[in-house]
């Protein structure tokens, strides 16, 4: 998208200077805000704020007592093999997180485990460490299989196993949809120790790849189990569970919540599991600052660019509800000289992996994504999450903002709220058990950016429309050629 938008900027001399104008206005605005008193700016902004009904939190609401805290000062206290302890040190893992402290000891003792913890709590290492510790004692192929709901999460889990097993000679492979089946079959024939897979593609290989079997599987992990079931993987999971052995198999189930579906799944697949719950309700980590910004109609793009100016030098994920918005905003950011890349479901697997790699490597500071990126992706350096579109359910909000403030780090999320989003925000606040504070801004200052942002957005929309027409024309051309070939075939007969 960056390259394509770059061509647009050359078409218009006016647009090429928009970024410079916005930067200059932003600097001027910052000086004005520093000169203005806080009291004045608050009174200016409060005149235009949208009134929102406050929800009272019931005083008699039942609160579950937290379990007694389990802590370890280092990974060495868990009695891991030296190679694993050294790998943790190399990764700057100073001490186990709460879910790791709860889940690793019973897992090392051989128990099935149910891990319930909020997003960003270090769940992946909580099951990877005990598996690798056991693998060191008994190395054999197809030792463990991890099931994940998305291709991106599966790749992240593979990277965690590779990092933690870097001193142990561990072989891993990632088996997901959207990639070549034959290449994956060759990877499986190399006898990896750990297989990380999405359920559908794993089932394809179990049924169609000669010589591949999980009859000697020792560990099965179902990560983000609530999402696995939400995405209708239930029937495939049932088929997989019937194929793989139950005797001699240890099973770990990790989820953000304990629903009735998950309870049914754990009864079907786990034996006398140890439940390790760090949090029994949806919540966000303490190091995350969550705010909202009330946006008048038609100004969401302008407010977004204002925020990106404020956060120059930081890494930002912008979440949208649609693929078109993700593409458009990525183009808008690039046209205005913010380095951005898009991640959404219309991209093929190589494009999605490429976008993530650019962001993780710091070659792009902004990732504009649909909810495909909201769950499970471990990108440690995300500073800011911006909800350009408010998610329609509270779970999605929790998982979006959980992309920042991970594993003890601090972070911030800002939600851009229009008058049509108030009901959605009230639901989110009810789940969080608190009201989200409003960002105090001078809307008159933000409005100075409006003309430049609107002009740039118009250029991006025109370019997207042009590309869509070209794509449709190519599609018609292909269909025409296919129909002509079919007619020729009929005539020959």
From Swiss-Prot:
Reaction(s) catalysed by this chain, per the record, are:
ATP + H2O = ADP + phosphate + H(+)
Q: Where is this motif: Q motif?
A: 73-101
Where are the bilayer-spanning segments? none
Q: Could you tell me the EC number(s) of this protein?
A: 3.6.4.13
The UniProt record lists the Helicase ATP-binding domain at 104-276
**Helicase C-terminal domain location:** 307-453
Which biological process terms from the Gene Ontology are attached to this UniProt entry?
maturation of SSU-rRNA from tricistronic rRNA transcript (SSU-rRNA, 5.8S rRNA, LSU-rRNA)
Q: Which InterPro entries match?
A: DDX47/Rrp3_DEADc (IPR044765), DEAD/DEAH_box_helicase_dom (IPR011545), DEAD_box_RNA_helicase (IPR050079), Helicase_ATP-bd (IPR014001), Helicase_C-like (IPR001650), P-loop_NTPase (IPR027417), RNA-helicase_DEAD-box_CS (IPR000629), RNA_helicase_DEAD_Q_motif (IPR014014)
**Which keywords label this protein?**
ATP-binding, Helicase, Hydrolase, Nucleotide-binding, Nucleus, Ribosome biogenesis, RNA-binding, rRNA processing
The main enzyme category here is hydrolase
Region (Disordered) residue spans: 26-68, 467-493
Which Pfam families does this one have? DEAD, Helicase_C
Basic and acidic residues biased stretches = 26-42, 51-62, 483-493
Q: Motif DEAD box: residue span?
A: 223-226
Report whether Plastid shows up as a keyword of the record: no
**Where does this polypeptide localize?**
Nucleus
Q: Provide a GO CC annotation, any one.
A: nucleolus
Name the residues that bind ATP: 117-124
Which Gene Ontology molecular function entries are recorded, alphabetically?
Answer: ATP binding; ATP hydrolysis activity; RNA binding; RNA helicase activity
Q: What is the stated purpose of this protein? A: ATP-dependent rRNA helicase required for pre-ribosomal RNA processing. Involved in the maturation of the 35S-pre-rRNA and to its cleavage to mature 18S rRNA.
- Comment block on domains: The Q motif is unique to and characteristic of the DEAD box family of RNA helicases and controls ATP binding and hydrolysis.
Q: Which family does it belong to?
A: Belongs to the DEAD box helicase family. DDX47/RRP3 subfamily.
Q: What assembly does the database describe for this protein?
A: Interacts with the SSU processome.
> What's the protein called, per UniProt?
ATP-dependent rRNA helicase RRP3
Species, as recorded: Candida glabrata (strain ATCC 2001 / BCRC 20586 / JCM 3761 / NBRC 0622 / NRRL Y-65 / CBS 138) (Yeast)
Underlying gene:
RRP3
